[in-house]
């Protein structure tokens, strides 16, 4: 990234910070499951002249003039999403996955309605009815969890709670669950109690697009997704459905219900990312993401670490650190010293607060974008294991420094996609 040739930019410390962040990304292993690297084309679209344009409303129904090309940009993003996921109706205006979920709630629910989602401790998301989130404050939220032994979603519990509480909306999907979802059974349960089914595929949308993860489209009334994470696009959200009636309600919930002007530069970047995901090489990428995650989880288990559910079907894994007597905050800190970025994550029955936790979440999407393969992830798993088992020893600093050098050497072989 070169910022030369502009006097104001050269004198602005902001751009020095951007360069430093680029160096951090280049020479670190990004294992945060919700992060990825956007292509130069995505970055260019997001930094384009569309930043300058207001466009409240929808295709051919804008509240501002000068939207001829804006309409075409948004329609391009919509048609690409329709083609990619097979959905009849797509709204690409949500600023984030959280606002996509909020729009669904606004469209389908009334304050005080019952909703049923996955517990945050078991891998759910804040927007699925957490008491600290708007979804938990405005609605009467109930939560299902995972089996304490297998770590898998307890579908019998889902059914029991649904039959007892008869929620208006059931939510499938989460932010820290490493296995497939039984969308068919979620659908049967929803039908049995007269509920609608929302699938939040923010994390695995790219894997669905690549044909490597089951699609919820045949089962869900409505689907929300993010366009970054495994889709490798800009930070943003979208909503998909095959129901024309719901689509109309959702459009009204986004605008004018929640948002004003859409971020057209971001929608353009979404169109780029969706176009990239339609290419044959994206299927290969999605498959590599899963292969890498499975190789990493398998090696971590062989080294004696405890993986939630014993492994993964997707791009992420969850390590339970309680057997080592460590916290997620500790492990996150020491891994970052070695140039490996992860995030602490709460677990079922976690005695630690969310700022500390007893687990960490790891993901393969970002490093797969750089071209890393299963052998690289096996090596990365060895480094993670070595650090975890050394944290309580006096030579942890030396071990982190040694692995930091190895990380730098490995990342040098895999340039960032925007370089």
Swiss-Prot record:
Official protein name in the record: Serine hydroxymethyltransferase 2
Residues that coordinate or bind (6S)-5,6,7,8-tetrahydrofolate: 120, 124-126
Site (Plays an important role in substrate specificity): 228
An annotated GO cellular component: cytosol
PROSITE patterns: SHMT
GO molecular-function terms, A-Z: glycine hydroxymethyltransferase activity; pyridoxal phosphate binding
Lineage, highest ranks first: Bacteria, Pseudomonadati, Pseudomonadota, Gammaproteobacteria, Enterobacterales
Cofactor(s) listed: pyridoxal 5'-phosphate
Annotated GO biological process: glycine biosynthetic process from serine; tetrahydrofolate interconversion
N6-(pyridoxal phosphate)lysine carried by residues: 229
One Pfam family linked to the record: SHMT
Keywords recorded for this protein, A-Z: Amino-acid biosynthesis, Cytoplasm, One-carbon metabolism, Pyridoxal phosphate, Transferase
Biochemical pathway: One-carbon metabolism; tetrahydrofolate interconversion; Amino-acid biosynthesis; glycine biosynthesis; glycine from L-serine: step 1/1
Keyword Aminoacyl-tRNA synthetase annotated: no
Source organism per UniProt: Salmonella typhi
Compartments it resides in: Cytoplasm
SUPFAM superfamilies xref list: PLP-dependent transferases
Reaction catalysed by this enzyme: (6R)-5,10-methylene-5,6,7,8-tetrahydrofolate + glycine + H2O = (6S)-5,6,7,8-tetrahydrofolate + L-serine
InterPro entries reported in the protein's UniProt record: PyrdxlP-dep_Trfase, PyrdxlP-dep_Trfase_major, PyrdxlP-dep_Trfase_small, Ser_HO-MeTrfase, Ser_HO-MeTrfase-like, Ser_HO-MeTrfase_PLP_BS, SHMT-like_dom
Keyword hit for Cytoplasm: yes
Membrane spanning stretches: none
Subunit and interaction comment: Homodimer.
Family per similarity comment: Belongs to the SHMT family.
The encoding gene: glyA2
Enzyme Commission (EC) number: 2.1.2.1
Annotated function: Catalyzes the reversible interconversion of serine and glycine with tetrahydrofolate (THF) serving as the one-carbon carrier. This reaction serves as the major source of one-carbon groups required for the biosynthesis of purines, thymidylate, methionine, and other important biomolecules. Also exhibits THF-independent aldolase activity toward beta-hydroxyamino acids, producing glycine and aldehydes, via a retro-aldol mechanism.
């Amino acid at each position: 990234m070169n910022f030369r040739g502009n006097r104001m930019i050269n004198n602005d410390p902001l751009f020095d910070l951007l360069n430093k962040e680029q160096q951090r990304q280049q020479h670190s292993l990004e294992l945060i499951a919700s992060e990825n690297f956007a292509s130069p084309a995505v970055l260019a679209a997001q930094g384009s002249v569309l930043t300058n344009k207001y466009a409240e409303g929808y295709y051919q129904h804008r509240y501002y003039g000068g939207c001829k090309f804006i309409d075409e940009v948004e329609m391009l993003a919509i048609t690409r999403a329709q083609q990619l996921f097979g959905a009849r109706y797509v709204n690409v205006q949500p600023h984030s996955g959280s606002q996509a979920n909020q729009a669904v709630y606004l469209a389908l629910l009334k304050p005080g309605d019952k909703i049923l989602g996955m517990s945050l401790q078991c891998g759910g998301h804040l927007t699925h009815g957490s008491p600290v989130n708007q979804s938990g404050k405005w609605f009467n939220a109930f939560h299902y969890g995972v089996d304490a032994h297998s770590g898998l979603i307890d579908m019998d519990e889902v059914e029991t709670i649904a039959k007892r509480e008869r929620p208006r909306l059931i939510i499938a999907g989460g932010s820290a669950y490493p296995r497939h979802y039984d969308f068919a059974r979620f659908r049967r349960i929803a039908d049995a109690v007269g509920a609608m089914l929302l699938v939040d595929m923010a994390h695995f949308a790219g894997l669905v697009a690549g044909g490597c993860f089951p699609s919820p489209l045949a089962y869900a009334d409505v689907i929300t997704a993010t366009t970054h994470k495994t889709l490798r696009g800009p930070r943003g959200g979208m909503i998909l459905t095959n129901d024309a009636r719901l689509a109309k309600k959702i459009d009204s919930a986004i605008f004018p219900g929640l948002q004003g002007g859409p971020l057209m530069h971001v929608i353009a970047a979404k169109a780029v990312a969706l176009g990239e995901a339609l290419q044959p090489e994206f299927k290969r990428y999605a498959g590599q993401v899963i292969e890498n995650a499975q190789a990493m989880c398998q090696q971590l288990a062989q080294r004696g670490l405890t993986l939630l559910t014993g492994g993964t079907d997707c791009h992420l894994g969850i390590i339970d650190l309680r057997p080592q007597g460590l916290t997620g905050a500790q492990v996150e800190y020491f891994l970052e010293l070695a140039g490996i970025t992860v995030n602490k994550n709460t677990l079922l029955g976690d005695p630690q607060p969310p700022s500390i936790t007893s687990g960490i979440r790891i993901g393969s999407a970002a490093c797969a974008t750089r071209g890393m393969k299963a052998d690289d992830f096996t090596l990365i798993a060895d480094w993670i294991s070595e650090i975890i088992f050394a944290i309580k020893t006096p030579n942890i600093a030396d071990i982190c420094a040694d692995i930091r050098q190895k990380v730098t050497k490995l990342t040098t072989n895999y340039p960032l996609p925007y370089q």
